[in-house]
Curated annotation (Swiss-Prot):
Homotetramer; dimer of dimers. It comes from Methanosarcina acetivorans (strain ATCC 35395 / DSM 2834 / JCM 12185 / C2A). This is Triosephosphate isomerase. The active site is at 93 (electrophile), 141 (proton acceptor). One of its GO terms (molecular function) is triose-phosphate isomerase activity.
Length: 222
């Protein structure tokens, strides 16, 4: 398999807010350059432009809506996040769930604006359904393990391998990420050994005392 993809979601953690968003992005950029591994960040929406202006690395939005230009007050417009500097977006994160129709509309809008789309899911059947929509990635994250420090790749390996198998049957062009509790080198290694092509993670890096050191530990067994 090729080099993994690592996507770091800042959520609304204090450490990843404002100037902190830039500092963590700098750490990601440094580790990405040293290792050759693609590391992307998903800061809060108002920080996208700030991070993009100061650090050269792939930036994802934490959410976008399936709306076009016009009368959509309070919505996240794909053109706006793209112009702010994002190259992709999460869709349907378990902390920002959407209806099936909304997922489909967000994905359509992401494609229209040339944004890479990661549809988040919570089990094998929803992963299979998401893959049928043909996003760039699906990210399987059992909600009960999110933020727990217990890695999905060790606590529930079947949900990762089951997702990989289900996606391969539906559309082998869709890449599978996994997430929840991932923070250490052995967690990422186990995720890759189960067939995933990368990880979506948050607290283990964003809340670490030294995010750069935490990232270096994360990739040490790749
Ligand atoms: O989006 C990533 C996420 O939900 C996993 O969070 O803190 O368990 O790495 P965490």
């Amino acid at each position: 398999m090729g080099s993994p993809f690592i996507l770091l979601n800042y959520k609304t953690y204090n450490q990843g807010t404002g100037q902190g968003a830039v500092e963590i992005a700098r750490a990601c950029r440094a580790v990405s350059e040293e290792s050759g591994i693609e590391i992307a960040v998903a800061p809060q929406l108002p920080d996208i432009y700030r991070v993009a202006s100061e650090v050269e690395l792939p930036i994802f939005s934490q959410h976008m809506d399936g709306v076009g230009a016009g009368s959509f007050t309070g919505h996240v417009f794909g053109k706006c996040i793209k112009e702010a500097g994002a190259v992709g977006t999460l869709i349907n994160h378990s902390e920002r769930r959407l209806t099936l129709a909304e997922i489909e509309a967000s994905l359509k809008a992401a494609k229209e604006f040339g944004l890479r789309a990661v549809i988040c899911t919570n089990n094998v059947p929803t992963t299979a359904a998401a893959a049928a929509l043909e996003p760039d990635y699906v990210a399987i994250e059992p909600p009960e393990l999110i933020g727990s420090g217990i890695p999905v790749s060790k606590a529930d390996p079947e949900v990762v391998s089951g997702s990989v198998e289900a996606v391969a049957k539906i559309n082998s062009g869709v890449k599978v990420l996994c997430g929840a509790g991932i923070s250490k080198g052995e967690d990422l290694r186990a995720a890759l050994d189960l067939g995933s092509q990368g990880v979506l993670l948050a607290s283990g890096i964003v809340k670490a005392a030294d995010p750069k050191a935490a990232l270096e530990d994360l990739i040490r067994l790749v």
